[in-house]
Amino acid sequence: MTRISRRSLIMLALLLLAVPAAAQGTDKVQRLTVPITDPARPITVHVSLMSGGIVMEAHEGKQVMIEVVPEDDGEAKERSGGMRVIPNRSLGLTVEEEDNEVSIGSDYSSKIEKLVIKVPRKTSVSASNVNDGDISVRGLEGELELNSVNGSITATDVAGSVVAHTTNGEVKVSFTSIQAGKSMSFVSFNGDVDVTFPSNLKADLHLTAGQGDIYTDFEFDLVPVESQTKSEREGKKFVVKLDQDVRARIEGGGAEMHFKTWNGSIYIRKAK
């Protein structure tokens, strides 16, 4: 199947999704199956939403299956003069697949409460959202890059590597195995950072917890760090800032793991 015909099929499916729920039955959830160019190879999924949550789960199939849960418009309200609201059911969603890469995106007018995306287990993910939803990933094997502004990030029973950053929310990750030698990063501005690693973890930890504490049940060695002094002039004031993180080494060291939170605590757990 050529690239053009594949995109045409996906866009046709999206047009069908836009049919009002009343014409399709009482189920407001819209569903779309995305064919993959070569199901024998791992895939990569890129998801970007302005508004709405993202849920990604592993399944045993070879396709990407998307469920779109629209916002609840509520019942149409009476307007002055007897006028009533006509619901706008445009999803504002775009899906493309090319050479085992699936891109899913929304525009500013999207009316999505959340996407539930089922993918083959060996899938790498780049997912981001801004408002009105969290990011949740379960059971995947690959490289995960997860970014949110106003939501929490959860990755459960994943294998490979994770970069998870959010501004307002918690970061919680549990690994079944990790990619040896791969650096990772876990950051929240307003929330706890809680990561569970396999018991055989070897890593060099870079830790910053501005207003909180750092906890671990791994055996570790602290690594001496020189304080970094930054000076700058702010108007008529001369400001000196002292910046120092905590460095620790587990089992002789390994890949660099960065943990950072300003208004929260850091938990580094050993899987039981």
Predicted feature residues:
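Acidic (Asp/Glu) and glycine-rich low-complexity loops/linkers
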Residues: 23-128, 138-139, 145, 162-165, ...
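Bacterial N-terminal signal peptides that target proteins for export
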Residues: 1-10
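N-terminal signal peptide c-region/cleavage motif recognized by signal peptidases
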Residues: 18-20
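Hydrophobic lipid-interacting interfaces of membrane-associated proteins
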Residues: 71, 133, 151, 169, ...
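A contiguous pocket-lining binding segment that forms or flanks enzyme active sites
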Residues: 183-186, 194-197
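Repeat-solenoid scaffold signature
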Residues: 188-192, 201-203
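Basic (Lys/Arg-enriched) interaction patch that binds polyanionic ligands
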Residues: 154, 158
